[in-house]
Design a protein with these regions (language model features):
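Alpha-helical elements of Rossmann-like donor-binding domains used by nucleotide-donor carbohydrate transfer enzymes
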Residues: 14, 18, 34, 55, ...
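Hydrophobic alpha-helical connector segments
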Residues: 59, 73-104, 154-161, 183
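Helix-loop "lid/cap" segments that line or gate small-molecule binding pockets
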Residues: 74-75, 90-97, 106-115, 188-194
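Hydrophobic/aromatic-rich alpha-helical bundle segments in the mid-to-C-terminal region
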Residues: 100-104, 108, 118-129, 143-190
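Short, intrinsically disordered or compositionally biased N-terminal tails of bacterial proteins
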Residues: 1-3
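Helix-turn-helix
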Residues: 10, 14, 18, 22-55, ...
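Short, basic, alpha-helical segments at the C-terminal edge of helix-turn-helix-like DNA-binding modules
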Residues: 62-69
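Short amphipathic alpha-helical elements of helix-turn-helix/winged-helix folds
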Residues: 18-22, 95, 164
């Protein structure tokens, strides 16, 4: 990669990071001017890299999904299928409860913007399919390694876990202590089920 391309990638990354912070603070109505000022670039640089505000919003959503997936996959990398599935639940719950700017933006884009913006809806559907498939595969892996009962319908369990995690994502308005109680109850139920 050339020095110029590397600099462009770095600028693009800095813009996305600044947009995440700005959208978390001001909502999706945050101005291009404010984001450009946060990064120390011109508004024209934002248009150069993303084409439009909608293009920047799409890239922020994709980056939020990449970060979430990376953290959850890393947390659930080792162990039996059962251990990995439970680690995925724990990691997701911790990340959702963190209320970091990144997760506030992920929630906002996932729950509202994706329903209003067709390009974001396509990204959301792809992410949901990938997430569901990953959870179903963890259940099947657990069935193969003997850590999850083979009598269980792997698809039903994976879909249930996915639905619960989606539910936890939407509970951001609840106090953190309440969120932790709900996650603990779900995790206990899941342990008993598996």
């Amino acid at each position: 990669m050339s020095t110029r391309a590397a600099a462009a990638d770095l600028t693009r990354t800095r813009i996305v990071d600044a947009a995440i912070e700005r959208f978390a603070a001001d909502g999706l109505g945050a101005s291009f001017d404010a984001i450009a000022a946060d990064v120390g670039v011109t508004k024209g640089a934002l248009y150069h890299h993303f084409g439009s505000k909608e293009g920047l919003v799409e890239e922020v959503y994709k980056e939020a999904i990449r970060r979430h997936a990376g953290r959850v996959i890393e947390a659930s990398r080792e162990g039996t299928g059962r251990e990995r599935l439970l680690a995925l639940v724990d990691a997701s719950a911790r990340l959702y409860a963190s209320r970091s700017p990144f997760y506030r933006v992920l929630v906002t884009l996932h729950l509202t913007a994706a329903m209003e913006r067709p390009a974001l809806a396509d990204i959301a559907r792809k992410m949901q399919r990938t997430q569901r498939d990953f959870m179903i595969e963890l259940v099947r892996e657990g069935q193969r390694d003997g850590s999850i009962a083979t009598a269980l319908d792997a698809e039903a369990v994976g879909l249930t876990v996915n639905a619960a995690l989606e539910g936890f994502l939407t509970q951001q308005l609840e106090p953190p202590a309440q969120q932790r109680r709900w996650v603990a109850k779900f995790r206990s139920l899941l342990e008993d089920l598996l």
